[in-house]
Regions:
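N-terminal pre-ligand scaffold of iron-sulfur
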Residues: 1-62, 76, 80, 89-108
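Short cysteine clusters
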Residues: 48, 67-70
Length: 108
């Protein structure tokens, strides 16, 4: 089933993602990474724009994730690369009754 861009999709429960970790999932054929931060949740496109590294497997510190392939860091709130020009799409994310919901952004 295809989702409209403005539709919310359930992507799991709060227990699926430990704090300061990420998980990659597929929503409507699009790979995204969901992260649990001390202050809430973040969701971005799962592939690093450099060489497609799996951002969902990256190291999370404060509000950034570091790509496990080449160390590029991305802000999980803005999607911007620290010290570079690359950007990943940021998706809306919400926790409702112990479930995690995402609304996809337009592809970047």
């Amino acid at each position: 089933m295809s989702l409209a861009i403005d539709a919310w999709a359930r992507v799991g429960t709060v227990d699926d993602v430990p704090e300061l970790e990420g998980r990659s999932i597929t929503v409507d054929g699009r790979r995204i990474a969901v992260f649990r931060l001390p202050t809430g949740w973040a969701a971005i496109d799962a592939a690093c724009p450099h060489l497609g590294g799996p951002l969902g497997d990256g190291l999370v510190a404060e509000r950034c994730v570091t790509c496990p392939l080449h160390g590029r860091r991305f802000d999980l709130v803005t999607g911007e690369q620290h010290g570079g020009d690359d950007v990943v799409a940021v998706h809306e994310i919400a926790e409702r009754h112990g479930e995690i919901w995402v609304r996809l952004a337009e592809p970047s």
